């Protein structure tokens, strides 16, 4: 242990930390701190030093796990993307098999308390909205976005097929997606923002305009 402390850039206290916390758990702690910093300072002004301060750890430990700011931001984005993917897929898997039940579960998942927090919404908006963050987002999240869109289009097509609607599934899915993104943005930018329940009711009002026999502002009929 003495030799490790002598040669480690982390210092004695930080060098001992991996013995107390598994590597994956420490990385997750640093990624969560990065989400907090991005939400507070924006994408371009996030630094490894700020992340270290937010986590209460040394800059050397952040560098040990991620080497560069770009790596840290990529890993943070991938973490958020995986969290989002797991959120909506687990909700649809737990829902009933009908098209309306599946559609509700997929859309309502965006407003669950674990996901729909000011910090996470701010981080997403930073990756979307800041010019320096968009290439990183497009490169690392494009495939998952395409899969999400395809699944949403499929559910809209099923609503046509199973319930007698006659809508363009691609355009309908697009409207539902941009409405979700719009209320997320509202919650981050309005001087007096509404909360997740009102945001979900706004989206469900949009869904009800397309599928009035199956949805209302309250959700499934």
Which residues make up each language-model segment?
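Helix-turn-helix
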Residues: 29, 33-75
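Hydrophobic alpha-helical connector segments
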Residues: 75, 89-119, 169-176, 221
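Short, basic, alpha-helical segments at the C-terminal edge of helix-turn-helix-like DNA-binding modules
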Residues: 78-84
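N-terminal intrinsically disordered/low-complexity leader segments
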Residues: 1-25, 215-221
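Amphipathic C-terminal alpha-helical segment
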Residues: 110-116, 133, 158, 176-194, ...
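Short, charged helix-capping/linker segments at alpha-helix termini
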Residues: 44-45, 161-169
């Amino acid at each position: 242990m003495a030799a490790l402390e002598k040669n480690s850039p982390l210092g004695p206290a930080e060098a001992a930390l991996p013995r107390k916390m598994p590597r994956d758990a420490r990385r997750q702690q640093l990624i969560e701190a990065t989400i907090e910093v991005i939400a507070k300072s924006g994408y371009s002004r996030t630094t490894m030093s700020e992340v270290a301060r937010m986590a209460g750890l040394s800059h050397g430990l952040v560098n040990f796990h991620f080497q560069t700011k770009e790596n840290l931001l990529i890993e943070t984005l991938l973490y958020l993307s995986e969290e989002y993917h797991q959120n909506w897929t687990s909700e649809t898997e737990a829902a009933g098999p009908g098209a309306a039940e599946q559609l509700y579960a997929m859309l309502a998942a965006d407003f669950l308390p674990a996901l729909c927090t000011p910090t996470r919404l701010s981080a997403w908006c930073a990756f979307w909205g800041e010019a320096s963050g968009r290439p990183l987002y497009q490169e690392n999240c494009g495939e998952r976005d395409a899969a999400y869109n395809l699944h949403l289009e499929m559910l809209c097509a099923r609503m046509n097929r199973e319930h007698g609607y006659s809508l363009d599934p691609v355009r309908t899915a697009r409207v539902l997606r941009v409405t979700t993104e719009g209320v997320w943005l509202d919650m981050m930018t309005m001087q007096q923002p509404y909360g997740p329940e009102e945001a979900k009711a706004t989206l469900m009002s949009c869904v009800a305009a397309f599928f009035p026999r199956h949805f209302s502002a309250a959700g499934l009929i």
